[in-house]
Amino acid sequence: SEPDMTKPLGCSSLRRTLQLKELYPEMEVKSIRGNLQTRLRKLDNGEYSGLILAAAGLKRLGLEKRICRYFSEDEILPAAGQGILAVQARAGEYQELLEVLNDPRSEAAAKAERAFVKVLNGGCTSPVAAYAEIRGSKCYITGLYWRESDENWFVEKTSGNKKEAELLGETLAHNMQKKYGK
């Protein structure tokens, strides 16, 4: 359903906010703080026309009936590694047991995304984003680069052999830095 255009969209992520302004240029996107219940209460009280939240968090809390729309990766590029689960163990312990849980495609995608973000010094609060997908023997990666100097952002894509996923992420980030500056 479409949002009420007279009230702002609530969002706590600069990365999502940048992309929302392109999706809904006629709408105000306003920062929202507080835990999930506080944010939902503000929505229910009419302060916002909608909230942009991670669906996984709502599902985990049994609140998926509150979800009215999902965004595709083409609409809102996710943070690197979003949706990928990791299992860690101390060195030398349980590696063989845990190896059966590893999905090589997810691992390659995660390496590409993390490499992109690392080159750009992106962190949890930085609006840098990357999404990689493995199809067959190829890795397809899309990156969002935010230029701090003027707060413009750019999205580019590349692809290559999945065995070089990490290098693909690094190369995309370096190319975007060269092309768009800092």
Regions found by a protein language model. Give the residues of each.
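Small-molecule-sensing regulatory modules
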Residues: 17, 22-182
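A conserved helix-loop-strand patch within extracytoplasmic ligand-binding domains
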Residues: 1-27
